């Protein structure tokens, strides 16, 4: 059995304290050894128009986790064909890191869309999934999916969209952003 490594894929547009709190909770209370923040250049189910620059999102993610040994930023999707599909990311990571057991971290909102994902049945078969709560989304996991687990992480309704909108409305959002991210974000 390898290192239990959570794969937390996202646009991180920008990364915020909700992302970090969830990842920390998964390490401390679900027993993950590490969480890798996989910055996604293009989620096939979202518009790319609203995304901050790829390299800026990657830099902000790195600044957000700086000094925390259980977190790592991963840019693997920058080198894979676009748009980014989770099955391709997971396969590549599994090949490159055979001594790790990968756990795919997903919100309840994405769990409801999961049947639309590329090769979702293969993900269910080959990887463990950790589904965290999101306000307004039920987490129903059929018994036929033994690799899928609902986690009881605290509900934090902070989103990157909320942060971008608040920033554009000239609101003080400093406490929603990790300290290392603030200098980057206020320059945008």
Swiss-Prot record:
Asked if the record carries the keyword Cell inner membrane, the reply is no
Reaction catalysed?
A: nicotinate beta-D-ribonucleotide + ATP + H(+) = deamido-NAD(+) + diphosphate
What biological-process GO terms show up in the record?
A: NAD biosynthetic process
InterPro entries given in the database record: Cyt_trans-like, NadD/NMNAT, Rossmann-like_a/b/a_fold
Q: Which Pfam families match?
A: CTP_transf_like (PF01467)
The UniProt keywords, alphabetically, are: ATP-binding, NAD, Nucleotide-binding, Nucleotidyltransferase, Pyridine nucleotide biosynthesis, Transferase
Which pathway features in its UniProt record? Cofactor biosynthesis; NAD(+) biosynthesis; deamido-NAD(+) from nicotinate D-ribonucleotide: step 1/1
The enzyme class is: transferase
Q: Which GO terms describe its molecular function?
A: ATP binding; nicotinate-nucleotide adenylyltransferase activity
Enzyme Commission no = 2.7.7.18
Q: Does the keyword Nucleus apply?
A: no
NCBIfam families, per the entry: cyt_tran_rel, nicotinate (nicotinamide) nucleotide adenylyltransferase
Instruction: Provide the family line.
Output: Belongs to the NadD family.
PANTHER family hit by this protein? NICOTINATE-NUCLEOTIDE ADENYLYLTRANSFERASE-RELATED, PHOSPHOPANTETHEINE ADENYLYLTRANSFERASE
Protein purpose: Catalyzes the reversible adenylation of nicotinate mononucleotide (NaMN) to nicotinic acid adenine dinucleotide (NaAD).
This protein is called: Probable nicotinate-nucleotide adenylyltransferase
Q: Which source organism?
A: Parabacteroides distasonis (strain ATCC 8503 / DSM 20701 / CIP 104284 / JCM 5825 / NCTC 11152)
